[in-house]
């Protein structure tokens, strides 16, 4: 396994997923679900999923996700965009599932919270490029640890209300 390739593949989804939280600092936020409920009577995604967060996640993931490739040339801008946008989509899917399971916003849901963004990013990206299975397995192993650590840092920085 080429560790440089591995880390440059997981970097855009990590950045996209981690940077969307900065939208919480904005004064005006617009929920992706417009405050509407699904057919089960519960919110579709919840207040924590906003258009601003989606835009920040995709833009930051694409730009910062591509940036190291100016040196290493592993993925292109399109690749960084696909990985970032699909990571944000995966996070939305995770929020949708959590709402269906009656979990409130911020409630921990292992391994859904830790892997939804990454597995969706890899699934969508694999429609365009081949991803070695060993990369997916390695990412599944290390992501929960990295996710927990970065969430704790975001909590300490008061970007998140919960440390998970």
Curated annotation (Swiss-Prot):
Classification via InterPro entries: CarS, CarS_archaea
Domain of life of the source: Archaea
Cofactor names: Mg(2+)
Encoding gene per record: carS
GO cellular component: plasma membrane
EC numbers for this chain: 2.7.7.67
Pfam family, one: CarS-like
Keywords, alphabetical: Cell membrane, Lipid biosynthesis, Lipid metabolism, Magnesium, Membrane, Phospholipid biosynthesis, Phospholipid metabolism, Transferase, Transmembrane, Transmembrane helix
Top-level class of the enzyme under EC nomenclature: transferase
Protein name from the UniProt record: CDP-archaeol synthase
Pathway: Membrane lipid metabolism; glycerophospholipid metabolism
Native source organism of the sequence: Pyrobaculum aerophilum (strain ATCC 51768 / DSM 7523 / JCM 9630 / CIP 104966 / NBRC 100827 / IM2)
Membrane-protein topology: Multi-pass membrane protein
Transmembrane domains' residue ranges: 3-23, 55-75, 77-97, 122-142
UniProt GO MF annotations: CDP-2,3-bis-(O-geranylgeranyl)-sn-glycerol synthase activity
Reaction catalysed by this enzyme: 2,3-bis-O-(geranylgeranyl)-sn-glycerol 1-phosphate + CTP + H(+) = CDP-2,3-bis-O-(geranylgeranyl)-sn-glycerol + diphosphate
Role description: Catalyzes the formation of CDP-2,3-bis-(O-geranylgeranyl)-sn-glycerol (CDP-archaeol) from 2,3-bis-(O-geranylgeranyl)-sn-glycerol 1-phosphate (DGGGP) and CTP. This reaction is the third ether-bond-formation step in the biosynthesis of archaeal membrane lipids.
